[in-house]
Amino acid sequence: RRLITEKALEPVPGNPKDPGTVYLCAADNEGNMISYIQSNYAGFGSGIVIPGTGIAMQNRGKGFCLEPGHANAAAPGKRPYHTIIPGFLTKQGKPMGPFGVMGGFMQPQGHVQVLTKLIDCGLNPQAAIDAPRWQWTQGLQVNMEPEFPAHLIEGLQQRGHKIGYDINRGAFGKGQMILATPHGTLMGGTEPRCEGACAAW
C-alpha cells in the first residue's frame, strides 16, 4: 500500500532482466491436476506471433542438428531435443500430483533429485524442493550447492569427481510441486531459489 499514492502516475512498462521459463501446477478438489511449462527459447522464440492472439510461437526447432545421421537430425515427423519437461507423478495408475523443475539442462537432474527426496527419503514436497542439489555439467565435474553435506562431497571426490561450488542458487533449477495425500489433502512446495508461491482458496 505504501507504493500506491493519490497522485496520477504515467504508466511505465516493466523491464525484465532476463527471459526465462515459467512453470505452473494446479489441482482442484475434484481431482483435476495440471503440470504446465512454457518457454519460448532464444529470447523471443521464433519471432512469429499468432495473429489476433499476442501469443509468440516457441523456437525449439533450433535444437535440431543439421548433420546427417545425427540422432537429433532434422527429419519429417521428428521432434527436437529440448528441456521442456512438465512432470506428473502417479502411483499404481492413480494421480499423485504435478511437479516441475525449470532450468534448461538442470531440468531432468532436478526432477530426479526432487523425486528421490520425496519418494526415497520420505520428505514432504516443500522439504524435497528445499533440499540441496548437485548439477553434473560435463566430464567428471559436479557442481554442488554450498549446503551439501561434506561427507557426500568427500565420497564423490574419492570416486574421482571434480567438485565445484556455485553460489548462483538459480543454477540448480527452480521447482514447484503439488502432492495429493491418500486422504485427498493437497500439499504444495515452492522454490526458495527464485520467485514462486503456493496458493490455496
Per-range role (PLM):
Residues 1-40, 52-53, 60, 167:
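Internal maturation/activation junctions in enzymes
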Residues 22-25, 35-49, 101-107, 177:
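Glycine-rich phosphate/pyrophosphate-binding beta-alpha loops
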Residues 101-123:
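Alpha-helical support elements that line or immediately flank enzyme active sites
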Residues 29-97, 121, 125:
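Active-site rim segments in enzyme catalytic domains, especially the processed small/beta chain
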Residues 19-24, 33, 82-87, 174-175:
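Short glycine-rich loop/turn motifs
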Residues 2-11, 18-19, 147-201:
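Cofactor-centric catalytic regions
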Residues 40, 60-63, 103-105, 133-135, ...:
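Acidic, glycine-rich active-site loops and adjacent beta-strand->loop/helix elements
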Residues 30, 77-78, 111, 120-170:
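Extended C-terminal subregions enriched in glycine
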